[in-house]
Amino acid sequence: MKIIIHYALILFFTFVNSAFSESKYHHMPHGKFRNPEGSPVRDPNFKWSYKTFNEEKKKIKISIPTDHVVPKNQVLENINKLKNEDYILWIGHATFLIKLGDNMIITDPVFEKNMGPLIFGPKRYVDPAIDLKNLPKINYFLQTHNHYDHLSTRTIKNFPFKNTEVLMPLRLSKHFEKNNYKKIIELDWYDQKKYTDITFTFLPSIHWSKRSLWDTNKSLWGSFLIEYKDKKILFLCDTGYGKIYKELGKKYGPIDITFINIGAYNFFPMAPKKDSSIYHTNPEEALQIGRDLNSKKLVGMHWGTVVLSLEPIMEPAQRFKKNASKFGYNENDATLFKIGEAKKISELIK
């Protein structure tokens, strides 16, 4: 594990490298990474086309239900009301606040209107639930991978808490170093970082990395297992479905709450069939991962914010709820948030 630490308080923490196996299958020659052994591979008949994608994207109706978003002033009021509670708040897409005791965690923060380089890339149809300047003090910044809808250099530059602990996959530190972050920690799969009352373990996911024409899979991707007191929370985004999750379930389950992507799965007609993305689970695959992990609760994310694929914008949530019972979950176990909504963890885990 490569650790870049620019501060002197290291004695307060312990660092543990807990390898899941002796092999490093995901480390490839020439400095690239790959998915866990036995993961699905892209259908050779998948033919990406910006022209086709943009033509099909224009057919998607952006109709936002009135109850999909909590007003910003109410979001701030709720944060203040819950200051003595543990809670989860959805800012949008893959960005959440997770409060556990005195620990405030933010995941994959992106606060810009468009999720791409400069002024390019897909544009949000729902703004972030809170402005960057109004964030509560953040103790831990979790970065899962480098795609533009998860890693924003503008958010990193303007983030108000440069002294926060930033945990990320291998080879992502440059984005933070040049913006003068003080506590930067790169993790390989199965590496663990322990603090006084909270532990983070970086685990595999089935995905990829890319920000330019020249850096495909040159940085790692993954998920974060958060352990606090007797709770286990897994932030799993982005991922496709694969056998690795049964293995992780045996090793780390049961999980109390798993955050998982339920949108961005349909690329037909470029893909030979619908719902066939190997890098983003459809709602049913997300529910199956929950079963494989022995996760008590699921939180659906990566939907309802920006158009990244070709399914109707509310379809992921509808299918997630509709099919939950087929995988042994009731509607309360397969949880969805409004953008800006905060829920007490004590009410999620009963």
Give the predicted meaning of each segment.
Residues S18-N134, M168-C237, D256-I262, K321-E341, I345-I349:
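Metallo-beta-lactamase
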Residues E22-M28, F33-P36, Y140, E165-L167, ...:
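Cap/insert and terminal regions of metallo-dependent hydrolase folds
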Residues I98, D108, H145, S152, ...:
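Divalent metal-coordination and catalytic microenvironments
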Residues F111-P128, W208-T216, N266-H280:
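Acidic/histidine-rich helix-loop elements
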